[in-house]
UniProtKB/Swiss-Prot annotation:
Transmembrane regions: none
Subunit structure, as described in the record: Ligand of high affinity for the PTH2 receptor (PTH2R).
Propeptide: 31-59
Gene Ontology CC annotation, any one: extracellular region
Tissue: Highly expressed in fetal and adult brain, cerebellum and trachea. Weakly expressed in spinal cord, fetal liver, kidney and heart.
Name under which the protein is recorded: Tuberoinfundibular peptide of 39 residues
Length: 100
């Protein structure tokens, strides 16, 4: 059986690539630009403290660390929204230009 390659215009290829980038979850990006898996996927720590002694005091996170984490999470969310807005406007522009 012979398979046939479907030829696509460069615009259609670009549109498909942009859709793929929008749909696939890429995880967290580091400063180097390398995407890491979401937190906890490759964790070396045990998933729970079921076998830990309940009398053992757990260290509390400082308020500054929690505030810093919330700030980073908000910055990531805003960056993702900005990327999505740019991608939607770019795809709309491509669709308008391709319209007959």
């Amino acid at each position: 059986m012979e398979t046939r390659q479907v030829s696509r215009s460069p615009r259609v290829r670009l549109l498909l690539l942009l859709l793929l980038l929008l749909v696939v979850p890429w995880g967290v990006r580091t400063a180097s630009g390398v995407a890491l898996p979401p937190v906890g996927v490759l964790s070396l720590r045990p998933p729970g403290r079921a076998w830990a002694d309940p009398a053992t005091p757990r260290p509390r996170r400082s308020l500054a660390l929690a505030d810093d984490a919330a700030f980073r999470e908000r910055a990531r969310l805003l960056a993702a929204l900005e990327r999505r807005h740019w991608l939607n406007s770019y795809m709309h522009k491509l669709l308008v230009l391709d319209a007959p």
